[in-house]
């Protein structure tokens, strides 16, 4: 299963809202767009239009990762995921695993400590070791769902990333190491961080295009 950056954001929002605001789930296009563009709990912050979100939904529908639902007497179409833990899903996740994957989809690579701090509305992790155990379980699967990135110089913890939106891991690790160079100024580090994010998205989109060509 490979997701583009926009697809990862949409799936992440649907997973999050299903848990945190079940009374509002499934989501309308308007609600889903607002969730994708939230200024908090999202990295990077996006500014997607409804048409961009709709195009993403259409792509996810073709991948059978979402379904539409129309309410009785309502013309508003709402969307729910088929990403995991449904009768149509091959992927089954425990609540702890779901929380970690959701956060990685919404906020990119994170340390176990960051995941524990940010997961309080999704799952109650008692301590960081419980998060680490969950990450290990996700990594030890027959088809790993997360990977450990190279530790950045000067950082106490290494970060993990999800493997649904695939990137060149060696490229990311090399650029991540550059971020901690003692000679780099704050402005240079910021520019490198932006470059890493851009390259991740470009590689993911190129792989999606290649897969589409191979399938045709």
From Swiss-Prot:
InterPro entries for this protein? DUF480 (IPR007432), WH-like_DNA-bd_sf (IPR036388), WH_DNA-bd_sf (IPR036390)
PANTHER family xref list: UPF0502 PROTEIN YCEH
Q: What family is reported?
A: Belongs to the UPF0502 family.
Q: What is the recorded name of this protein?
A: UPF0502 protein Spea_2482
């Amino acid at each position: 299963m490979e997701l583009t950056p926009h697809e990862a954001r949409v799936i992440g929002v649907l997973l999050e809202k299903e848990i945190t605001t079940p009374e509002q789930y499934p989501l309308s296009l308007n609600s889903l767009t607002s969730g994708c563009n939230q200024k908090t709990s999202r990295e990077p912050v996006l500014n997607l239009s409804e048409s961009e979100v709709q195009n993403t939904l259409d792509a996810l529908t073709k991948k059978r990762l979402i379904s539409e639902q129309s309410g009785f007497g309502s013309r508003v179409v709402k969307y729910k995921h088929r990403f995991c833990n449904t009768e149509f899903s091959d992927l089954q996740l425990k609540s702890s695993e779901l929380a970690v994957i959701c956060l990685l989809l919404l906020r990119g690579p994170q340390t176990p400590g960051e995941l524990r701090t940010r997961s309080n509305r999704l799952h109650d992790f008692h301590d960081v070791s419980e998060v680490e155990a969950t990450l290990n379980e996700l990594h030890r699967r027959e088809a790993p769902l997360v990977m450990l990135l190279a530790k950045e110089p000067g950082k106490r913890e290494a970060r993990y990333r999800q493997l649904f939106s695939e990137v060149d891991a060696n490229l990311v690790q090399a650029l991540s190491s550059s971020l901690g160079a003692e000679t780099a100024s704050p402005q240079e580090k910021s520019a490198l961080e932006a470059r890493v994010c851009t390259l991740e998205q470009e590689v993911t989109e190129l792989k999606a295009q290649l897969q589409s060509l191979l399938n045709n």
